[in-house]
Design a protein with these regions (language model features):
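An N-terminal alpha-helical hairpin/helix-loop-helix interaction module that forms a charged
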Residues: 1-120, 137-205
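Helix-hairpin-helix
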Residues: 115-132
Length: 205
């Protein structure tokens, strides 16, 4: 990690936004993404007892993808079509993957989900990491491919190579590095993990 670049980015950020992500100048962006409201919806829609109904879980998955500003308009209808095409067995597996991601063995859930999505050409970092991020925005990271590649290059994150196919191995290694970076800056920047990676993205412009 290039700590000098990170601290310089922090200083520049506070020069424009003295209150960090609580600064009024950033409110329009925060309102547009509405992560807090969607996060509360995800907590309710994906509560552990809801997983007794896999059909409902996959429909809720599609709903959150449609609502989210983090997913491209191009991918949203593809996810809706995927859910319509799925057999009951595939819906069960997607539901199991989401349960493991949120409540069980995260590595297994991650790989199962990537495998299911791959059958429909949708094994995308953004889609795999969306629900876990909304469910726990302080501990889980939303992974956006271009931003991720730029962060690795700009902040000199060595011994890690980005690949388009989502894997838990990369996710665990990359997010550990992000946590180390987050620990080096003010809590006014690092509370919401998408906000933190947004801060890093702004630093690279």
């Amino acid at each position: 990690m290039n700590l000098e670049k990170l601290k310089e980015a922090e200083a520049n950020f506070f020069a424009f936004y003295p209150k960090g992500f609580e600064d009024e100048a950033l409110l329009p962006i925060i309102k547009r993404h509405n992560t807090e409201k969607i996060g509360k919806s995800v907590e309710e829609l994906f509560a552990s007892e809801r997983f007794q109904n896999p059909d409902e879980i996959v429909e809720n998955f599609s709903k959150i993808v449609s609502k989210s500003t983090l997913i491209s308009l191009f991918e949203k209808p593809k996810v809706r079509d995927m859910i319509k095409q799925m057999s009951m067995e595939q819906k069960d597996m997607l539901s199991i993957a989401l349960y493991e991601l949120l409540y069980g063995k995260k590595d297994q859930g991650f790989e199962i989900m990537a495998d299911i999505l791959a059958r429909y050409g949708l094994a995308k970092w953004s889609i795999v990491t969306l629900i876990p991020y909304y469910y726990d925005r302080e501990n889980n990271f939303f992974i956006k491919p271009n931003t991720t590649k730029d962060i690795i290059k700009f902040f000199d994150l060595h011994d890690i190579v980005y690949k388009p196919r989502p894997t838990y191995e990369f996710y665990a290694k990359y997010t550990k590095l992000l946590e180390e970076m987050k620990a080096q800056v003010s809590p006014l920047i690092g509370k919401d993990n998408a906000g933190f990676t947004g801060f890093l993205m702004m630093a690279m412009k």
